[in-house]
Amino acid sequence: TALAITDHGCAYAFPEAAHALSKGDDFKLIFGCEGYLVDDLKEIVVNSNGASLDASYVVFDIETTGFHPSKNKIIEIGAVKVINGEITDRFSEFINPRVPIPFTIERLTGINDAMVCDAPGVEEILPKFLSFCEGCVLVAHNASFDTSFIRYNAEQLGIEFPPTYVDTVGLARFLLPHLGRFKLDTVAKEL
């Protein structure tokens, strides 16, 4: 006699089933798993509160000294505010990270120590940026990266940061699956 067990997207039941049936030799276990090749659980719109892109949104990007919010620093925030389909305001600020910018980041971003040495710190710029964004949906390419840095630094400053945001990487994967690569320049060329 055989018993087939199938889990969906995980293998949590396998050890339990094997243990339960290990006491007797009358059953043969057949394990199966439904796997997901695409992370369709990743949200395109995060913290949706019914806000609409028809009214106003802020498209933004940050540059950092690395890839980990708790270890690396924001060195630039750039954004445009769009109201009723028109760019109505711009935000562009360098931030002094108070640490040297690694050469690899300088090559990647074009931002060097001389460009940020006289800039204000994140404690001055981040509240201005959040004020600029107030009442707007945020939009970014790979938004989880950008918002993780904003969130971490906001927490360090005692500022709440529960925004609604749209990740254009997820949107591009959904709308342009034939691309294969979803770097911002690749998506922009396709559009």
Give the role of each language-model region:
Residues 1-64, 80-81, 86-87, 98, ...:
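Phosphodiester-processing cores and adjacent nucleic acid-binding clamps
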Residues 68-104:
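Active-site acidic carboxylates
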Residues 88, 97, 107-109, 123, ...:
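Glycine/alanine-rich phosphate-binding loops at beta-alpha junctions
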Residues 102, 126, 150, 184-185:
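Generic structural marker for isolated residues within well-ordered, non-membrane alpha-helices
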Residues 103-111, 165:
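Gly-rich Lys/Arg/Thr-decorated short loops/hinges at beta-loop-alpha junctions or inter-strand turns
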Residues 108-126:
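Metal-dependent phosphoesterase signature
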Residues 158, 187-191:
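Short, intrinsically disordered, charge-balanced linker/junction segments flanking boundaries
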